[in-house]
């Protein structure tokens, strides 16, 4: 896509997939609004975006407050006059066994990873429908299709986002508003070394965030609803075909001597 007339709002944009997506959109001439908690990092991303799209803006915000997230989406709409694309990307990990997580921690993960994307979507959706156009991009995870050991809270939040996106895509048929679901796999971002999380069992290669960002940009104008980045759909199909075998493999991975090593 290249269209200087488009405006996109991207959450979780101070690093990783969000920052890369904002830069990729701006490089194509799209004016971007970017949201994240870390002001200094966000300012760096904004500077890069403005070198291509000078009317881009930023908002420093904590998306663990869904009503606040909704108000922010409305503010962004008022600031720009419209939003053509909403990229719900912000997310936090919770990588510990279910025996060592609290309800409060689960609730925070759900607020950031699921409820705030829903709140922001519902805030802009009536106006998109009224205009007869718009695209909602929800960035879930491969963990939104696979229940990954030690990631019960994270997977639950991403499963929820997948279900919401699927139902919404059907609900919005004929309105001119599109829904795109993005499911990244193991991506080279800060999610792997966040405080309060156990080391990851996965120690294989990581896909660069820029590759995922380019995939998200392509997804916006795609005719397809679901986008695995990289393509890991076969793993999901294997689980669906034989869950017992999938679970056996998951347990074997968790019990490897090197599992969880860094």
Describe every region a protein language model picked out.
Residues 28-45:
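Conserved glycine-rich Rossmann-like NAD(P)H-binding loop of the short-chain dehydrogenase/reductase
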């Amino acid at each position: 896509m290249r269209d200087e007339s488009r405006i996109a709002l991207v959450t979780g944009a101070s690093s990783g997939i969000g920052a890369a997506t904002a830069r990729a959109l701006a490089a194509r001439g799209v004016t971007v609004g970017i949201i994240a908690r870390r002001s200094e990092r966000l300012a760096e991303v904004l500077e890069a975006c403005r070198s291509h799209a000078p009317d881009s803006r930023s908002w420093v915000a904590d998306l663990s407050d869904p009503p606040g997230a909704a108000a922010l989406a409305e503010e962004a709409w008022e600031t720009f006059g419209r939003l053509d694309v909403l990229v719900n990307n912000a997310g936090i990990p919770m990588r510990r066994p279910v025996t060592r997580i609290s309800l409060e921690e689960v609730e925070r993960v759900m607020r950031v990873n699921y409820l705030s994307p829903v709140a922001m979507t519902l805030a802009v959706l009536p106006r998109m429908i009224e205009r007869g156009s718009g695209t909602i991009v929800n960035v879930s995870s491969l963990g939104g299709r696979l229940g990954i050991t030690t990631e019960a809270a994270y997977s639950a939040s991403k499963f929820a986002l997948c279900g919401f996106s699927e139902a919404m895509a059907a609900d919005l048929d004929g309105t001119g508003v599109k829904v795109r679901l993005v499911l990244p796999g193991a991506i080279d971002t800060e999610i792997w070394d966040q405080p309060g999380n156990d080391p990851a069992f996965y120690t294989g290669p990581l896909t660069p965030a820029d590759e995922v960002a380019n995939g998200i940009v392509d997804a916006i104008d795609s005719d397809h609803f679901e986008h695995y980045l990289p393509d890991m759909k076969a793993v999901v199909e294997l689980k669906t075909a034989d869950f017992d075998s999938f679970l056996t493999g998951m347990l074997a991975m968790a019990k490897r001597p090197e599992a969880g090593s860094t």
